């Protein structure tokens, strides 16, 4: 009944991944991002992550795998997803939704820390404001974006962009693969 649809969805996902994989710049950006994160951890820094909707879930998943575990039994790494409901509702009410991430970065971000901002469109105003706040704090910035990078294009130290112009779910599928690879590389780098 839905077998053709299922095959089409899986083929499109595989094609999106294959296109991403063809660009060596993506491979280099992932490696650079992992090394930047590991260097921050080794120097006593932390990573803050943020995004909206599915990207918010990815930001939480990234932090959870770092503080908990991914594949290896090892110490937890300092990672915080900006996901505290009381913070988000307070700042959203008192300042506005566009400030929910930047206020948190202002409060706990420090020089030597890293911000991971995730947006499939690259146009999330609250993530863009978080990037600006991170810059003011002297933090490094890594972004996971899609399409043409949107307004976030060129704002990060390292941008990992999925140049897919269809639905956001294909971009999110690559983002979660990138997140898992980042964690795997961080685990390898931290035991050196």
Swiss-Prot record:
Keyword Amino-acid biosynthesis: no
Keywords assigned: Carbohydrate metabolism, Cytoplasm, Isomerase, Metal-binding, Zinc
Catalyzed reaction equations: 2 D-sedoheptulose 7-phosphate = D-glycero-alpha-D-manno-heptose 7-phosphate + D-glycero-beta-D-manno-heptose 7-phosphate
GO cellular component term of the entry, any: cytoplasm
Main location: cytoplasm
Single biological process term from Gene Ontology: carbohydrate metabolic process
Record domain SIS: where: 37-192
Cofactors that this protein relies on: Zn(2+)
Protein's pathway: Carbohydrate biosynthesis; D-glycero-D-manno-heptose 7-phosphate biosynthesis; D-glycero-alpha-D-manno-heptose 7-phosphate and D-glycero-beta-D-manno-heptose 7-phosphate from sedoheptulose 7-phosphate: step 1/1
Role according to the record: Catalyzes the isomerization of sedoheptulose 7-phosphate in D-glycero-D-manno-heptose 7-phosphate.
Family: Belongs to the SIS family. GmhA subfamily.
NCBIfam families: gmhA, PRK00414.1
Name this protein carries in UniProt: Phosphoheptose isomerase
Source organism per UniProt: Escherichia coli O127:H6 (strain E2348/69 / EPEC)
Gene name per UniProt: gmhA
